[in-house]
Amino acid sequence: MKALKTLNPYFWKHRNLLFLGFLFIIASNFFIIYKVQFIGQAVDELAKTSKFGVNFKIIKNVLIFIGSSLLTGLFTFMMRQTIIVSSRKIEFELKNKIYTHYQEMSLTDYKKTTIGDLMNRLSEDVVAIRMYLGPGVMYIVNLFVLLVITSAKMLQTDWEMTLWSLLPAPILSLIIYKVSGVISKKSKIMQASQSAVSTFVTDTISGIRVVKFFAKEFYFLDNYDKKISDYKDKAINLARIEASFFTSILFVIGILNAGILYIGGQKYIDGEISIGTIANFFLYVNTLIWPFSLVGWITSVNQRAEASMQRVNEFLDMKSEIINTNFENYEIKGDIEFRNVSYIYPNTGIKALENVSFSIKSGESLAIMGKTGCGKTTIALLLCRLIDPTEGEILVDGKNLKEHNLYLYRQHIGYVPQESYLFSDTIENNIGFAIDTPNIDTIIKYAKIADVDKNIIEFKDQYHTMVGERGVMLSGGQKQRICIARALIKQPTILIFDDSLSALDSQTESNIINNINEEIKNKTIILITHRESSTERMDRILKL
């Protein structure tokens, strides 16, 4: 349970609520056991009574039993309201922590995993952890408290029968110890299979156009069937083990009841105890049946939580390579210099850049050309400091890029990526996304500069048109131009186009470049392109 120890700070943070919950557990179990003795007294009273009529002692015992049951219900409700609520709060905080960490992860970290796996850790794994934090902890403490109170009351009633009743405890402990390890291993295997299913479904939905273009629906259905069948088999295998665990515990408790009946019967015949005492012992033991029957479920919950916490910790333990060490405010002018910059992608070992050097002054423009795979996009990623160079250094305004305030610097960067990405929102919100307080007039202005306003006004809802997931409702050229408008509306100091005019015809491309030159003055512009015509208005050209 080493991984679950990382939850200790959360327990400490919510210690007051949890402590209150534990007090309610003690109170609830006290009244559960307290009322049992009155059943025994009522049984003994009935055994002594030989005629029908009102027996006030029996009525008194029944009323006390009912009152204790009401108090038990009240404290049980309060127990759940404190412990379960605290688990929900910790779940909320843990999800926020994971999501925040996802935001801080570098691109290199993202390439090590899949979106489906990331989503699974944020949803399914956190739910498994929350089940441990709430019901898991609550039932463990409840069982312990109930066992202590019940054992004390049983010892007070008859110590010999108590020892016989507790005799199976070592057997139960051995079963729990042996099976919990198996459940832990099977849980990890099942959760890995579940992540594989989530990843496959995410990839299929994201690439549904390609699937349909190539008429591969049945191929993907066949693959999905294999993956979901594998998950089903692993889940059923785990369920069988859990069911066997549950059955074993009930079997041991059944033997225990038979033992109480035999030993209690012998002692009653010998006149050592009353029939009410036997009734009390049956009630004491059967009070433990429900908590003990949950031991298998609790063990399963805890082992699943352990496996899930390990998976979550794998990501939380990742330290981003991109670290901000400067929090000052200052002006970014836009002078850029690459000094013998090399970059090797860590996941593949591919050398994208080797000893690249160039410089560009603030307000100048640079076109970068070269064959596919020569490292043009890598330069864009380095300039945005989404990755850091393997060798060499990048200077901005004469200072190493690593020494700049990362968040301030990125606020001065306008980046139009090679792959146009739009959020599932309106056109207005997608363009205005780049600034804090966008207004429609500003949005329209930059949509016109990006030469996309004429298309937007033809839509029924114009700027309020929903673009669909990843902009699926728009053409490739429309998505590119909306992304350009989104970058321009920031009025950035440094503007980077990463082959982001490729889906446009030459006339539209020319219109956009002319508009940018007219409307955006004294900005550093870097244009990555394959087209010779796109470089005509650039001050410099770098060929890789």
Language model segments and positions:
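An intracellular "coupling" helix at the cytosolic face of ABC transporter transmembrane type-1 domains
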Residues: E104-T108, E124-L133, V137, V182-T199, ...
